[in-house]
């Protein structure tokens, strides 16, 4: 058994070294500083907006994975076994409930509650993982019964945009039953933020109400150029 565990540990270490983006997220002081900085900026914005608004309902909308919870152990395990992401293994990882908070996340969530706000978790974890996700967030000090969790379903129309709309308007399965103001949106991908024609847009509100955390492990950029205005010249100067 000891030999087996040593072998697995060696495999995970090799996977981390082969996937420098995961090692950077897990081990670098810079990653911790960047995520903490983003959350501190978001907290300052929320507290400024909350002054004099305590009796009016408001919330922050946050993603879960690689925003509040660190899932790099899952990706290291998959890399060690040379396996791609798949839903069964991901659901099994969620069921463990062992993901730790991203640096700065727990303090931000606590600050929101201290300022009189509520937290809305809008995530593409599937609805079938709701209970284990709540348990993980609770263990990490980031869940209360006053929160809302809006997860992915098999209904293609239940997009993150629609979930955010329900939260703001107070209707549907995601809303609190009353309209609320959203003081901040935070996530590790642009899809976690309002679209151009939605609630002030994402770029226009960047650093004011919309906040992006670094995630070099995965995203739409893996499959094509996503940077606005970037011209691809096929190597021709």
Predicted regions and their residues:
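Short, acidic loop-to-helix structural element flanking the phosphoryl-transfer center
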Residues: 91-120, 127-128
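Solvent-exposed, polar/charged alpha-helical surfaces in well-ordered, non-transmembrane soluble domains
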Residues: 40, 44, 103-110, 131, ...
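Non-catalytic pre-domain segments flanking phosphatase-related domains
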Residues: 2-62, 226-237
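Active-site-adjacent structural elements in enzyme catalytic domains
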Residues: 53-78
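Metal-dependent phosphoesterase signature
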Residues: 69, 75-101
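C-terminal cap/substrate-recognition subdomain and adjoining C-terminal extension
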Residues: 29, 126, 130-237
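Structural motif
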Residues: 59, 118, 182-184
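Sec-exported extracytoplasmic/periplasmic mature domains
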Residues: 47, 51, 74, 110-118, ...
